[in-house]
Amino acid sequence: MATRKSAAPNRSFKVSDQIQRDLAELIARELKDPRVGMVTLQSVEVTPDYAHAKVYFSLLVGDPQATQEALNQAAGFLRNGLFKRLHIHTVPTLHFIYDRTSERAADMNALIAKAVSSRGKEE
């Protein structure tokens, strides 16, 4: 007897990926808020019922808090734009979260470089 794998995780991944691509385009082309600068969408996590989506973003320059506030204020506008593009029954409510991974990586690299340089001086 063959067991059937659930397609839900794969579909959820596809929906998250499509939301990420469409949101990136909407933010770049249609969002006119000056607080939103060079935003990179890192990932999108959608709840199993597609009611909510956490959208993780990073910035090249700018104030992360102001950008997060601007994106969350524009969430309804962006969700409406997704309605026109996505062919799913429920378009999730968007929640934008600043992703500090790149900052942490830069801090770790700086600490490693400092440790290596201080070790070189001791020898």
Swiss-Prot record:
Keywords linked to the UniProt accession: Cytoplasm, Ribosome biogenesis
CC terms in the record's Gene Ontology section: cytosol
InterPro entries listed in its UniProt record: KH_dom-like_a/b, RbfA, RbfA_dom_sf
Keyword Cytoplasm carried by entry: yes
Keyword Cytoplasm: yes
GO function terms (MF aspect): ribosomal small subunit binding
Pfam (any one): RBFA
UniProt main location, coarse: cytoplasm
Localization annotation: Cytoplasm
UniProt cross-references to SUPFAM superfamilies, sorted A to Z: Ribosome-binding factor A, RbfA
GO biological process, any: maturation of SSU-rRNA
Function, in words: One of several proteins that assist in the late maturation steps of the functional core of the 30S ribosomal subunit. Associates with free 30S ribosomal subunits (but not with 30S subunits that are part of 70S ribosomes or polysomes). Required for efficient processing of 16S rRNA. May interact with the 5'-terminal helix region of 16S rRNA.
Family in the record: Belongs to the RbfA family.
Subunit description: Monomer. Binds 30S ribosomal subunits, but not 50S ribosomal subunits or 70S ribosomes.
Protein name: Ribosome-binding factor A
Natural source organism: Delftia acidovorans (strain DSM 14801 / SPH-1)
Gene that encodes it: rbfA
